[in-house]
Amino acid sequence: HRSETITSPSKLEDFIAVLRFLSSKKNKRVVLSLHPNTMDNLRKRGLKMPKNIIISPPFKFTDYVFLMKNADLVFSDSGTLAEESSLLNLKAINLREEQERHEAMDESATILVGFNKDRILDAVDFYEKRNGNQENLNSTVQDYEVSNFSEKMVKTVISYTDYVNRIVWQR
């Protein structure tokens, strides 16, 4: 759903080619959750999907988490994939050229591959060689193991409300 993904014909076509390959050669059913803009771009380009690729509008977050937890492998360009992969112990391939979650990269929570077909397939092969072993796939990223996170966030919001109103919104 990222703009650099859906506005780049080559990235979109490379990704669809990988999905076609995986769905046919690996005999896997693929659930592809697409934002409306991405769906429009697929239609405009006339890109067709095999029958075992199920296209769906975006899921509610709880349904999306359920789907990820029960997937053999998760591909996403989402900014939150690092957290989800770390906390849910997912086999995750991050379809971005870069990411803001450096702490997750330092602890290898995902495999960052961009849209290069060969790199994506290398990541798939890496996970397949684990023979389905999910145990200890990811250790939780240390920065995500904060026991009183909610309390800290409330204190931060309270602390910065006046500052943001004054400096950002000039109220």
Residue ranges of each PLM-predicted region?
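Nucleotide-activated sugar donor-binding and catalytic core shared by glycosyltransferases
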Residues: 2-171
